[in-house]
Amino acid sequence: MRRRNFLLLSGSGLAAAGLAACGGSGGGGGESGGSEVEVFTWWAQGSEKAGLDALVEQFEKDYPDLTFVNGSVAGGAGSAAKDMLQSRLQAGDPPDTFQAHAGLELADYIDAGQLEDVSDLYDEYGLTEAFPSDLVELLTLDDKIYSVPSNIHRSNVVWTNVELLEAAGIDPSAVPSDVDAFIADVQKAADSGVTGLSIGTTWTQVNLLEAILMADLGSEAYNGLWTGETDWNGAEVTTAVGHFEQLIALTNTDRDGLDWTDATQMQIDGTAAYSVMGDWAVASFQQAEWEDGKDFGYFPLTGGEAIFGFLADSFTLPVGAPNPDGAKAWLDTISSQDGQLAFSLAKGSIPARTDVDTEEFPAYQQTAITSYAEDAISPSLAHGAATPVAWLNEISDATSKFTTGASDAAGYQEELATIAEKHASA
């Protein structure tokens, strides 16, 4: 029920909501008590840490009597943090608040009774009016809401090193019309003597897989993969798996030892032409003082349909949190106009609120704002919007087997289909 509700919304409702460019000021009342507030995230490095630092700065302005305690754990798009978090929750030792991806990633925590209902905060902080109505509906389960989004990201973005593309005879302003055309360009870049497509460990490979599936299947059929309405054994999935195999062959051989920051750094260092990564990568290019359009470029991986690969960072209130009032103060800051503006400017995302002044956002975020308002919306697999954690973990294991040579394309597709049959009917 949850899965179908999310995917029905993601096809059109969220896209219609958009973002307005109007002014406003942030929240922040004045919780006092001098208590520590442990905030558990996986934002431990690069632009992610820069985004967290921006939130902490705003939090300290909003609540000077509270002390932020950084519980960040690095690695694997949150996989290391989620493993540690699960151990703590099972041991009855929750942090005051923890980061999660909005969507079905939260289902396991909700089913285990590990999250408090924060619906009252939506009324207290005015969030029901500030967030798009369809986003609020997406976050609602049985008339309860269990997380507060801090921003919205796009997962299906191709990033380019303009100089390397030009050296390979590729027009950096031309957007490939489909995945076959993109593969041809990556091959051309590889033939010029650089890594065609830089990538990291398993979760970044799953991010590439989802981008290919979106492009090859289109939004409706891609969304159907998670509801049982699209056959994982179908010809379109076979095509997508073949494209994935071709692109993996054009990536760096040390990929399994790298994270996304390392893969992006390969482009900045001039050793890789392309990457496929969420739009948090833009902050890395900006921090390197690269100029948009001159040094780096970007476009969504497409098969013809304009699709926004959706994910949202959010924060929760765990059952048994040592300082629930401190956690609520953090939720106030991250959902405020000032908090969402500061965070998204630093992290490369766009605000979840519709009343944040977006005029000062750089060019990439402006394109994301437009796309989010106009394009089809599909939930990210790699980042918890499309499936519960258990399903994603099994896809990740199957993907690792495939990219390390332990299975072939046919076996990989068959395993993906078996995993889907197990979970889609659950």
Please name every model-derived segment.
Residues 2-107, 112, 172, 361, ...:
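Conserved N-terminal structural module of periplasmic/extracytoplasmic solute-binding proteins
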Residues 61, 249-250, 287-349, 407:
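Extracytoplasmic/periplasmic substrate-recognition and gating elements
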Residues 64, 296-299, 344-396, 425-426:
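Long, aromatic- and glycine/proline-rich binding clefts that accommodate carbohydrate-like moieties
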Residues 72-84, 103, 177-183, 255-268:
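Short helix-initiation/N-cap motifs at beta->coil->alpha
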Residues 101-155, 363:
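Hinge/lid segment of periplasmic solute-binding proteins
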Residues 119-131, 174-177, 197, 216-239, ...:
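Short, solvent-exposed loop/beta-turn-alpha elements that line the ligand-binding surface or hinge
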Residues 141-150, 156, 180-229, 272:
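Extracytoplasmic/periplasmic solute-binding protein
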Residues 184-188, 227-256:
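Glycine-centered hinge/linker elements that transmit conformational signals in sensory
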